[in-house]
């Protein structure tokens, strides 16, 4: 199953396939202003021209196939993208990449590309739900923290938990109300 084609999902797919990034809230707000001003396709074409306008169709196709996680059938996927881009004016390659991504997202039952399409859709859905404030590589965990019983203390107050992370005065304190 493909993702719901909202402008957010389309932009996240475009950013992931071309830039290897998921868009945070600050950048998404700027993108939405651009979309409001000139429309989605014009925005994608503008971003593409600015960032990749000097690349060949083969370079773009290789970048997209790599970022989509296509390993099986990658040569055929690159050839397909090169063919589609080659049939269009370079001024609409951003929109064309978006159309290729939409077609790819529906290939979940395909014997060759199905697993990659399914994994890609999962990444796009996660990116669309992303509410962070910074832009990070698509699929990146922003931070993790492992708690160990010997170094971390938990104190219970009325309807509130207070966690102290660390054993010095410079520890991190987290209050959780419930």
Give the ranges of each region predicted by the language model:
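Substrate/cofactor-recognition hotspot
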Residues: 1-178
